[in-house]
UniProtKB/Swiss-Prot annotation:
<keyword id="KW-0862">Zinc</keyword>
<feature type="zinc finger region" description="C3H1-type 5">
    <location>
        <begin position="324"/>
        <end position="352"/>
    </location>
</feature>
<keyword id="KW-0238">DNA-binding</keyword>
<feature type="region of interest" description="Disordered">
    <location>
        <begin position="383"/>
        <end position="417"/>
    </location>
</feature>
<dbReference type="GO" id="GO:0005634">
    <property type="term" value="C:nucleus"/>
</dbReference>
<keyword id="KW-0677">Repeat</keyword>
<dbReference type="InterPro" id="IPR000571">
    <property type="entry name" value="Znf_CCCH"/>
</dbReference>
<keyword id="KW-0863">Zinc-finger</keyword>
<feature type="zinc finger region" description="C3H1-type 1">
    <location>
        <begin position="31"/>
        <end position="58"/>
    </location>
</feature>
<dbReference type="GO" id="GO:0008270">
    <property type="term" value="F:zinc ion binding"/>
</dbReference>
<feature type="zinc finger region" description="C3H1-type 4">
    <location>
        <begin position="278"/>
        <end position="306"/>
    </location>
</feature>
<dbReference type="InterPro" id="IPR036855">
    <property type="entry name" value="Znf_CCCH_sf"/>
</dbReference>
<dbReference type="GO" id="GO:0003729">
    <property type="term" value="F:mRNA binding"/>
</dbReference>
<protein>
    <recommendedName>
        <fullName>Zinc finger CCCH domain-containing protein ZFN-like</fullName>
    </recommendedName>
</protein>
<feature type="zinc finger region" description="C3H1-type 2">
    <location>
        <begin position="75"/>
        <end position="103"/>
    </location>
</feature>
<dbReference type="InterPro" id="IPR050974">
    <property type="entry name" value="Plant_ZF_CCCH"/>
</dbReference>
<dbReference type="GO" id="GO:0003677">
    <property type="term" value="F:DNA binding"/>
</dbReference>
Amino acid sequence: MEFDTIPQEAMWQMNLRSSETMESGPYPEHPGEPDCSYYIRTGLCRFGATCRFNHPPNRKLAIATARMKGEFPERLGQPECQYYLKTGTCKFGATCRFHHPKDKAGVAGRVALNILGYPLRPNESERAYYLRTGQCKFGNTCKFHHPQPSNMVLSMRGSTVYPTVQSPTTPGQQSYAAGITNWSSSSYVPSPRWQGPSSYAPLILPQGVVSVPGWSTYGGQMGSESPQQTMRNDQTYGTSHQGELENAGLQGAYSQYRSGSVPVGFYALQRDNIFPERPDQPECQFYMKTGDCKFGAVCRFHHPRERQIPAPDCVLSPIGLPLRPGEPLCVFYSRYGICKFGPSCKFDHPMGIFTYNVASPLADTPGRRLLGSSSGTAALSLSSEGLVESGTAKPRRLSLSETRPIPPGDDNIDDEG
């Protein structure tokens, strides 16, 4: 009987004490002592008036004050807060149940930073997104490795991205600084990737198409013109200008074009090779064709530094693109004036498709002449509706893949008007 009664009384007393201590009530305030973490977290304290820690009346204000001051609880005997060791802060504040030593605040996160402000962690794996773009949204708190960007391509918006090019003039003529009137700013060719005004520096070129080593990823031969030809930009080169063409040194079968009307086929800069070299892996076919790779440093194929470019099997235009009269027209080139495949492209890249008549205003010219014929045959014009054959009785629209034979020896371009 007594044996059954004692445990029941003890249990009743324990329950009573538990209910009494868990009730909210006045708890002792010890301003010089640390705050009671259990009280701060729950508003209750099982020790009641015998607790030796501080119990501030306004718990929310105490939590906010602790976070603002950077004061975090020190709990000797408890595991150290890893987030506190890395960053020097703790989102749980005074309610965190781990140990926060003041002398180790952020000591684990004190790593060396690269020139862009990202952490260098040689023992960790490299951040793939950073290797491709040069940016990392996690900043200096990222746990991955961010190597120095010495071999990376950085987006330098608003800076001069093209090197200074010397004008192909006579030795006695002034250089770029004094002879800026002999230069022209070549506008960018419209592209679906270039929407709106560009914040990049404009491409400065002289009146002739200048060959600059390293600008293009393929070895095309680009011609330049003599000072006599620079003064005659309002004329179209034909068979009567053979003497001037010989002095200018233009090469290729379609060199009788006004150089001021020739678009630049490639906007590429000479840069360090950022693509990985993996001799034991197959070669990246896209890189071998274009010299670029969208996967960057994370590509698993081989990217040889010295790319063996096969010799072209056709005549190249002055901007280094293949001339294949019997093949369909390169659609991308016909729209934007560039071709990423360079001399390895299997389509035709005629030069006359982008020849403008600078003698008359562009507003008076509804279309652009395309490989006109002096023998009275139908000529093609490139208008807003596409390719139109305008020399016939009824103009008809042509597809970009349709080709028409060019009479032999007829490689002149007729000025419109």
